[in-house]
Amino acid sequence: NQKTILGHPSGLYVLFFTEMWERFSYYGMRAILVLFLVSSFTEGGWGWERSEALSLYALYTGLVYVTPIFGGLIADQILGYRNAIIIGALIMTLGHAAMALEVFYDFFLYVGLICLIIGNGLFKPNISSIVGKLYKTEGQDKDAGYTIFYMGINSGAFLGILLCGYIGENEGWHYGFGLAGIFMFLGMLQFYYAQNIFGSIGVFNKNNSKEKVVDESSGKDL
């Protein structure tokens, strides 16, 4: 029963911008991670060999695609979609902040990457799930809604790579990491304060969770 904007539920645009800023932070950080690791000490980097930097990058990227499996289960059984998104966004914000502080202590970079992996696992699968819940039936409207949502992903990725890359290379790598964190924080705040627009969508309900498990195991529509 949400109001519509351009034929779509108004909540879609909250998700659009939340996802856009999260993708800004994700791709912005990824764009400069390897460059930072291979840069010399005089340039503010760690002076790693290219193979070492790519190994860490590959490990991080691989784990980012694994943790959403667990994040989806946790949201279904314990947190609910909305709480999972907020907690995940907060953990990712702290992760970016930790990476920005690597200039003081090297281990902050690793702490930051771990936070990003965990936070992404909670955030990514559940924000996409809410998009689907906005529409009562399958059809062109739902397909178009996902298209709009993915436009936010692409826009955030483009802006993140552009701005974090520029700031990181020209002003300092930690500033690039910090900029990614700022926009992740903005995305989290936006979702947190606008979440009531979704009504009961994404709120954890123990009874509904049990029904969902029974439904999926039996193959019947409850």
Pin down the residues of each PLM region.
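Glycine-rich segments within core transmembrane alpha-helices of 12-TM secondary carriers
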Residues: 64, 140-169, 176-187
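Central cavity-lining transmembrane alpha-helices of secondary-active solute carriers
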Residues: 54-76, 124, 158
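Intracellular juxtamembrane helix-capping segments at the cytosolic ends
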Residues: 122-136
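Short amphipathic helix-loop junctions that connect adjacent transmembrane helices
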Residues: 31-54
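Primarily marks hydrophobic transmembrane alpha-helices of the MFS/SLC 12-helix fold
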Residues: 84-85
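C-terminal ends and interior cores of transmembrane alpha-helices
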Residues: 88-107
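Intracellular loop-helix junctions on the cytosolic face of multi-pass helical membrane proteins
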Residues: 1-14, 137, 165-222
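Hydrophobic core of transmembrane alpha-helices in multi-pass small-molecule transporters
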Residues: 95, 106-123
